[in-house]
């Protein structure tokens, strides 16, 4: 009996019976048992960063990451050594506001070793963005260290879309401080946040 004939015959069955019939046919096509089908691991990726502040370039990578992975965790690093403009609560808030209508995205902060955080979240991939060749050397070094610490966790490098390839949080803050127009480069909530931060600051 051909697959088409089997499908037409089984389509007339009750909804519950039809579901299991189609499941059985799917599993046969994949060469696995029904138990194995439901035990296929959903992949979770962690996208870490300081995000001071989040830009549309960051959001672009998040969207593309969701095309590849079932779940994305945006991990905002506390990282006090970088002396961020926005505190950790503000940075997390900005991202949550920007992605609030998205599915399968979590946003939270972390202050421990990245590889330990990834294991805590039961993720198996780290996403890192590369704007330029100059970023690659540092990120490669970090990915090799992470692999040394845990060989089961992979790092995926992603290039930003061309329209965002020039963006960096540092440049955006400088432009905002000098009263430049950053609309279209950061989420609206960040535009408002930067205006508040620099409202009473004078250019020296």
Predicted region positions:
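Nucleotidyltransferase catalytic core that binds NTPs
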Residues: 32-204
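A cross-taxon signal for low-complexity, glycine/charged-rich
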Residues: 1-11, 15-18, 23-36
């Amino acid at each position: 009996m051909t697959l088409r004939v089997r499908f037409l015959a089984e389509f007339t069955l009750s909804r519950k019976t039809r579901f299991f019939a189609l499941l059985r046919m799917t599993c046969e096509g994949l060469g696995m048992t029904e138990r194995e089908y439901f035990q296929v691991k959903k992949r979770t990726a962690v996208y870490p960063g300081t995000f001071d502040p989040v830009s549309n370039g960051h959001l672009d990578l998040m969207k593309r990451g969701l095309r590849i992975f079932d779940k994305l965790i945006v991990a905002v690093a506390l990282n006090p050594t970088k002396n961020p403009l926005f505190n950790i609560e503000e940075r997390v808030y900005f991202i949550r506001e920007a992605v609030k209508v998205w599915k399968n995205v979590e946003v939270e902060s972390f202050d421990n070793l990245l590889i330990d955080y990834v294991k805590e979240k039961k993720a198996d991939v780290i996403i890192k963005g590369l704007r330029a060749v100059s970023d690659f050397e540092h990120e490669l070094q970090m990915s090799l260290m992470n692999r040394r610490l845990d060989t089961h966790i992979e790092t995926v490098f992603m290039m930003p879309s061309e329209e965002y390839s020039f963006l960096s949080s540092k440049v955006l803050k400088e432009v905002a401080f000098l009263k430049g127009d950053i609309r279209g480069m950061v989420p609206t909530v960040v535009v408002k946040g930067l205006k508040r931060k620099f409202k009473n600051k004078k250019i020296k």
